[in-house]
Each structure stands twice: as C-alpha cells, then as structure tokens.
Amino acid sequence: MNDYNHYFHFPREEWRKLEVSKDQILTAEELEEIRGLNDRISLQDISEIYLPLIKLIAIQYHEAIFIHGEKMEYLKKKESRAPFIIALAGSVAVGKSTTARVFKLMLDRWFSKTRQVELVTTDGFLYPNKVLEERGIMDKKGFPESYDRDRFAKFLTDLKANKEDVEIPLYSHFTYDVLDETRVIHNPDIVIIEGINVLQADQHESLFPSDFFDFSVYMDANEADIKKWYLERFFMLRETAFQDESSYFHPYTKISKQEAETFALGVWDTINGVNLKENIEKTKYRADLVLQKGTDHLISDIYLRK
C-alpha cells in the first residue's frame, strides 16, 4: 500500500526552501560525534532537512503549551503540561539512532537549553535474553512479543501523568542484553522516544503507545537499501566493536568473511527483514511525518500529515 493521500508531499528541493530564522546550529565536528556507524548524514541534510523540521516541531511544541495554558485558565486549574513526546520509528539500520541524537542536540540549541530534552530508546524495554530464551522467542528479538509492553506503557503513563522522576531501563548493544541498571529522568520538557516498535499497536490493549505522542516521525527507505546498509554496518562492527572478546558477537570475528556474510544475511532474511515487512513498515502511515531516504542516505522526500 502506498497511501499518502492524507499527507502533504515535499520533494527535497521544496522542503529546503522553507524559511528558518536560525542559522546552522550544528558544526561538522559535532555531527561527526553523534553520527552512527555507516550513517552518512551530512551538514547539508542538517541545514536543508532537519533545521526546517526542528522549526516545525518547535511550532507544535509552543502550540501545545499555549492550548494547555488556555485550558488550565478556563478550568481554573494549576497544573503544568506533561512532557511533549516525539516518537521516531523505522527499520533496523535505517538511521533512527543518529536522527534521534540530531533531534536532541538541535532542540537543545533551538531552545538555547531553556528546555530539558531527553532521549530514550525502546531497546531497554526488551525482555532480558534469559526471558526470551525461556519463552523460546530469542529468534524473535525485536518483534512485538519480545518487548515488555506493560513496562513501556507504565513509562509512558508516568510521563504523561507528570511524575517528577521516571525510570528508564537500559540496554547494551555490546552484550546484546538489557542491563541491570536504570536511568532516571527528572521533569523533562521534551522526550524523544526512538525505536522500531514505537508506532506499533496491540489490538488487545486499551491504550496504544501512539495515544501518548505529540509528534511522530517514521524513517523510510527501500528494503534493498536498508538490507545493504545493515550488512555494511555488520562488517564495520566486525572489524571494530566485535573484536572485543566481551562482545556478544565476538565469535563472528573468528569465522571467514563468507561465513560471516551468510550469518548476517540469515539474520536479515529470517528476523530483521521479516519484522520490517510484518510489523514495522505497516506503522508508517500512523506517523505525522515520513522521511524518505534514497540509496545515497540523503533524505529525498518528506511527507507531512495534513
């Protein structure tokens, strides 16, 4: 299905002409620090795509604050507005993590650090490997059933209930498992939630995660390109992080390149690719905005819900 009927379509050349009052707010050095492995996001993307997008998010943030203030004044209540939540979804290897870090840094700069912006990934809400193994779904890691949805729902509810301190479980891509420790965020103004599953809906639940979001973004690309980027990233990690003997994937540095490629292709064809087609891709039209990437990693088209 290709249903963009309820979206405005902005080709890159049209989007980049949107007026933004602020100058470039990231340097090349800062971008290099937050860029993910094999993610070729450039300063050109920052100025032409992300700066207009950050302005749009800022407009919606201020509108939400204004409406809340008007409502509280009318109701004669005194309660601060719950955090403004931005959701960022998309496939493995499409560039979500880098984009989420770009959002955080640019929002910090846009508001001159007068707003507390927090970044949360949904990886921490996966069940620990031990639980996945006990349930026989280790090969479904990343699928909806591999997430502790009750814990994620409580996290979102706590945020929207204006709870002062909200606990976030942490995940290590090094050990490929949920960590024992957690992180606490205190009274955030804006929260960016990044993960493959953030726009997924469970028909058996009374609340969907999207019920809590103020703005949602889906990062899209052709599956063949995403698969290629996934394989490239796997081999980059094989030469770097996987070399550490403590890494979960260290054994794959001891086999031949051809064997490693067979393994990585198998993971894509039986797990990541299947999850993309069955669960992730269908959430695209729930997003407020879709960023379409081309083969060269550059954003080619933007779709904004009307």
UniProtKB/Swiss-Prot annotation:
A GO molecular function held by the record:
pantothenate kinase activity
Which Pfam families does the UniProt entry name for this protein?
PRK
Q: Which UniProt keywords apply?
A: ATP-binding, Coenzyme A biosynthesis, Cytoplasm, Kinase, Nucleotide-binding, Transferase
SUPFAM superfamilies associated with the record: P-loop containing nucleoside triphosphate hydrolases
Q: Which pathway features in its UniProt record?
A: Cofactor biosynthesis; coenzyme A biosynthesis; CoA from (R)-pantothenate: step 1/5
Reaction catalysis annotation:
(R)-pantothenate + ATP = (R)-4'-phosphopantothenate + ADP + H(+)
Q: Which residues form a coiled coil?
A: none
What Gene3D superfamilies does UniProt report for this protein, alphabetically?
P-loop containing nucleotide triphosphate hydrolases (3.40.50.300)
**HAMAP family associated with the record:** Pantothen_kinase_1 (MF_00215)
- Family to which the UniProt record says this protein belongs: Belongs to the prokaryotic pantothenate kinase family.
The name on file for this protein is Pantothenate kinase
The UniProt gene name for this protein comes to coaA
